[in-house]
Every structure is written in C-alpha cells, then in structure tokens.
A protein has these predicted regions:
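Helix-to-loop junction immediately C-terminal to a conserved catalytic motif
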Residues: 51
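Conserved ABC ATPase signature
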Residues: 151-155
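Catalytic Walker B motif of ABC-type/P-loop ATPase nucleotide-binding domains
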Residues: 176-180
C-alpha cells in the first residue's frame, strides 16, 4: 500500500538561497504527523511545495502515489489533499454552518453569499441537503455543534481555527495539511484542538500533517 504522502529529497531554492534542503519523510494512511521547528526553518515552504503552491527545485512529492508536479491544483484536491492556512479565510458576515457550505473567502465573488443563504430555503435539492448534513456532522466531530449558527465575526481565534478545520473536511479529504492550527491560541484551547483532531483522525481514518513551532 502506498503512503498517503511521500516526500523524497525535496529541495527548494529562491535564487541562491536554499530554503529547503533534501527533506524526505512519509505520512502513512491514518497517521497524524507533525513538522516542528522555529520560524524560518522551511516548514511553510515545504508545505507549499507539497500542496503545489510552489514549484520545487528538486525531489519528488507524491500524494497517494501521484506526483504533485504533474497535477493541476484542482487535480491535487481530487487526489485527496486539502490544506488550511495559518490565517483563516472565513466569511465574517456568514454563520459557522454557512462557512462550511461555501469555498474560502477570495476564491469567488460576493454573490457566493446569496448562494449560501439559498441553501437554507425550503427548495434546496438533495445534494445540498447532504452537504448540510455533512457540515453538521463535521461540527459534531470537532465538538463545536453549539456554534453552528454563530457569525464567524463573533468567534475567538481558536474557535475560528476549529471552524476552518471543519470546512476543510467538507470535501472528504484523505490527506489534510494544517498550517499552524493552534498559532496564537491559548494553551487549554490549543490542547482541545489537538485532541479533537486526533479524535477526527480515529473516526475518519484520514491522514494529517501539521506544522507548528513546538
């Protein structure tokens, strides 16, 4: 069985600056792995190369046996990979559950708000009903169902992180990359986020790779 993620000899240079040098590791299916290190050590650059946002200088990155460099961004997602970013991209004028039903901010125009609102009208179709059910299920997995109808502008930083993670699960990824999911979050809530993530991994069998400072 191929690993969920296989990184071999990854190298990334910016001009004459070596940002990532000969990095190799694997993430098996159902495994929870962390890349830990201080600012400037190349964690985010590694993440960006894995998710196809940066073109690597050398090496190989495979997601479930498929070379990332041969895939378009939409094909990478279809291969099973989804990522979050350090700074959440939530629609602050929407509720938590509405955010779960639409793509991240800045990917579409403002009319996406009208689309999100329409999902709650009586004539929504069965496909949209299924997405709504999955959105509530994801909030249950992260133990935040009580926040479903709160505006995201009312959430704390840690709560926003949880909502962003929940939205990333809507596409049913097999490999989830989390960029500093507890950055700036107080200790008790940070531990809650990690515990909820571990429970989610156990329940769904997905693979998770995170980067953090410690």
């Amino acid at each position: 069985m191929k690993p969920a993620l296989n990184v071999m000899g990854l190298r990334k240079m910016f001009g004459g600056l070596v940002a990532v040098d000969d990095v190799s590791f694997e993430v098996e299916e159902g495994e929870f792995v962390g890349l830990i290190g201080p600012n400037g050590c190349g964690k985010s650059t590694t993440f960006n190369c894995i998710s196809g946002l940066l073109e690597k200088t050398a090496g190989t990155v495979e997601v479930f046996g498929k070379d990332v460099t041969e895939l378009r961004p939409d094909q990478i997602q279809k291969a099973g990979l989804t990522r979050t970013f350090q700074h959440t991209r939530l629609w602050r004028e929407m509720t938590v559950i509405e955010n779960d039903l639409v793509p991240p901010r800045n990917q579409f125009g403002t009319t996406i708000l009208e689309r999100a609102r329409s999902l709650f009208l009586p004539w929504r179709n069965p496909k949209e009903e299924a997405r709504l059910e999955r959105a509530y299920s994801t909030l249950d997995q992260l133990e935040v169902p009580h926040m479903a109808h709160n505006l995201t502008s009312e959430l704390s930083g840690g709560q926003s992180k949880l909502v962003d993670i929940g939205r990333s699960m809507m596409g049913e990824p097999k490999l989830l990359l989390l960029d500093e999911p507890v950055a700036g979050v107080a200790g008790p809530l940070a531990m809650k986020i990690f515990n909820n993530l571990r429970n989610m991994v156990d329940e769904t069998g997905i693979s998770v790779l995170i980067i953090e400072h410690n």
